[in-house]
Amino acid sequence: MSRDEGTAKAKRVQVVGAPPPVHVGIRAPDTDSEHEHEEEHDGHLIDAESGANTNPTDDENESMRELMSVFPDDETDLDLTHLRIKSTKPLNLGRFHNTLIRLGLRQNEIRSMHGKDLGAVPHLKELDLYDNAIEHISGLENNLELEVLDLSFNNIRHVSRIAHLPKCHTLFLVQNKIAHIRPTDLQPPIPLSLRSLELGGNRLRSLENLSQLTNLEELWVGKNKITSLDGIASLKKLKILSIQSNRLTKLEGLDSLEALEELYLSHNGLTKLENLE
């Protein structure tokens, strides 16, 4: 929002319905139980319901190696969407060690993030693992140049092993199984760089342990179970707050958000709007 030189910034808050979606399509709420759905036997992942081995077969590995052979060694952008990839190992990412900037692996069947593979491309700035089967965040120890990370539509329960990313400004964790943010999950240095955080469609009941994200400008937490805005007051640079489809019954802490421009509140338990001056 622009302002004339020498005049105070006007606070413009939009209390509207659902904002334009960032991700195309939103799945129905996850109804899986809290229990794990896979077992580990002899280092191989086994689907607990079907008993099927989820590791790629030799034929699948060979097919993937053939596919990757068409890319030059100096490739900067790999889009490997919807190819039934189960593991990053046959991608041989080390071949792109010096040049790869963007890696798209959305809509595949990847269950694990391996540091040996992802760490082989240390200059990576954008990593897209949207719509896979990942349960734990890992393998990003050497990806210190990462700026955008998309782990939406997976089976992640904890926001772990990303706090060390000093340049990450955009983090997508939409539609996972995250019930709470632990104190160590978003400790420095990531609070210094993070500008946009998307946690919509999870199992959050509060905004606990987000107060250290003092540079955050966008927070998207729609479709959770949040009952209170406690902790929001410290996010003084926040410009967009999307908290529709939660369990709010009153508004608190918004008066300190002087940079706030857009506020999405539809589908809560509010009976009147207060503290929006």
Specify the residue positions occupied by each region the protein language model found.
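The feature captures the LRR N-terminal capping module
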Residues: 1-135, 144-153, 157, 166-205, ...
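Low-complexity, polar/charged sequence tracts that form flexible coils or short amphipathic helices
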Residues: 93, 116-119, 139-142, 161-164, ...
